[in-house]
Amino acid sequence: MITALIMAGGEGTRFWPLSRKDHPKQFLKLNDNQKTMLQETVERINELVPLEQVFIATNEAYQKAIKKQLDGIPEENIIVEPMKRNTAACIGLSSVVIEDKYTGSTMIVLPADHLIKDHKRFVDILRKSIMTAATGKNLVTIGIEPTHPETGYGYIHFGDQLHTIDGDQVFEVRNFTEKPDLSTAKEFLEEGTYLWNSGMFIWQLSSILANIETHLPEMYESLDRIKNALGTDLAQKVIRDEFEKMQSVSIDYGIMEKADDIFVIPGSFGWDDLGSWPALERVKKVDADGNVVIGKHYGIDTTNSIIHSPNKVVTTIGLDDVVIVDTEDAILICDKKRAQEVKEIRNILEAEGLEDCL
């Protein structure tokens, strides 16, 4: 039995001001096929996992949007996190809920807001990851073969080759590294033993729960109490009370950096996490001046820029390497090279109490 967990609770802060708290990145149509990121994520795995075996982890505010976008998904398959507790708690809670319904299944864990161009190749890598996860109590992740020195991603350092599956290599993981500076990213690329950390995982439910018990024992105790309450009138109260106690830690730091038997399968299938505005250059048409324009733009000597203004005419003179995003109540203008800092400017607005703009 194969199940899937789609993590769809994030706010997509680096895509502000288009991505908002009440309508974040996973609900946006950033590709040219008029489907949201969430819809694309679910559709690309449908030949492996039928909709009734797909679970969505999110927060209460996004329940209605998910039901609307994923017509036919069972309501009980929408797992609501009572509050923010990072990915380890999210995956832990979801694992207990899924194990209760599909005992003994293998679970695919995917972010809701990534772009994948080569669906066939992606599904092929997933199949091989599932086969690898079934061979023991190992935890499997998919690493992306880097194409350039990227500072916006974490990296996976892989070691010895363990085996191959129909031509695809499976490696042991030596360690996970945080987002590097540019010089370190260049070293990683030259060394050839580093992959981008995609945040995609495949494992048996029993394996991830055993690792939570070993490495996050207090969280496991809370999960065990939740497990015992499922199906009772007290279930929602117990979930809220126990989830609140859980440590806020990422699955990478809490489990993957500490566990034994971590395997990685390199993949190259047109992956992009669309982590910030410059990513649109990789998925949208770029004009003769190197600009990505969504809306109406008239410019003089304006090059290599991203301009998103579907409702207003934007005019520019003498600009290069900038991002301009116009929405009804907020405008972003920034140096394209500093687009990763959009999250920080958003934090400033939050500190100033400008909740309506978030």
Give the location of each predicted region.
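Short coil/turn connectors at secondary-structure junctions
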Residues: 1-2, 51-52, 74-75, 102-105, ...
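Conserved N-terminal catalytic core of the sugar/cofactor nucleotidyltransferase
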Residues: 1-6, 14-21, 32-111, 115-127, ...
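Residue-level signal for inorganic ion chemistry
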Residues: 38, 94, 113, 156, ...
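A short acidic, often aromatic-flanked loop/helix-cap motif at beta-alpha or helix-coil junctions
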Residues: 84-89, 148-150, 182-184, 271-272
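A residue-level structural signature of the nucleotidyltransferase/glycosyltransferase Rossmann-like core
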Residues: 107, 193, 200-201, 272, ...
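Conserved core of the sugar-phosphate nucleotidyltransferase
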Residues: 119-240, 263, 336
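Left-handed beta-helix
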Residues: 205-358
